[in-house]
Amino acid sequence: MYELKEKSYPMQPRERLELLGEEYLSDVELLAILLRTGRKKYSSLNLALELLQHFGTLDNFRKASISELKEISGIGQTKAIELRAMIELGKRIQTTTRKRYGQVLSSKEYGMSLAFEMQNFEQEHLTATYLDGQNQIIEKKTIFIGAFNHATASPREILYHAVKNLSVGLLVAHNHPSGNLQPSQADKIFTKKIKNACDNIGINFIDHIIVGAGNYYSFRERDSNLF
């Protein structure tokens, strides 16, 4: 069994979370925080590492029963129950989020929904919608408000949140306050940049939708060369 040394983690997980934010911690560090303690001569980091190595994947860990968790030395009845409670709470939070946001069934349905949602926006808004494998919406995020410069726009922030959310699919949308739905050349270039970036990291770029005057334009529906 590989053992983590203190020098591998110059700061303890709680300190790193407070300083950097939880998204910068490894799976081992996050689990170590939840475990709080290890066992004799064995830190919580080492116990967390052993747990994850034993089950192989986070999905297998998620499915582990109390008795299966207790097979690991240092995981007693109390810790096993606490871990199961943590896993169940995470599942319920995810389910609540999905119920709140709903599911994307088609570009038409979602385009018309966005057209209604953004119809009174006087400034241009760029939004990103992140989906799981069943097209359930994980998060809807406003990326930019104002005179959006497509020429200098980078997919980086959009994809940062996609990776953070473990997204399988991505929809991007922006409004034209003028009501003119026709995409500019800059819109087309931006769409291609996002599509290429998604392809490079294995995320399904579902569509780029333009909305205005109560209607929508779908690149997927209208521009087959891009999709």
UniProtKB/Swiss-Prot annotation:
Keywords: Hydrolase, Metal-binding, Metalloprotease, Protease, Zinc. GO terms for biological process: proteolysis. A motif (JAMM motif) lies at residues 174-187. It comes from the Bacteria. InterPro entries: MPN (IPR037518), RadC_JAB (IPR025657), RuvA_2-like (IPR010994), UPF0758 (IPR001405), UPF0758_CS (IPR020891), UPF0758_N (IPR046778). PROSITE patterns: MPN, UPF0758. The keyword 4Fe-4S does not apply. Residues 103-225 form the MPN domain. GO terms for molecular function: metal ion binding; metallopeptidase activity. Pfam families: RadC, UPF0758_N. Zn(2+) binds at H174, H176, D187. CDD domains: MPN_DUF2466. Belongs to the UPF0758 family. This is UPF0758 protein llmg_1515. It comes from Lactococcus lactis subsp. cremoris (strain MG1363).
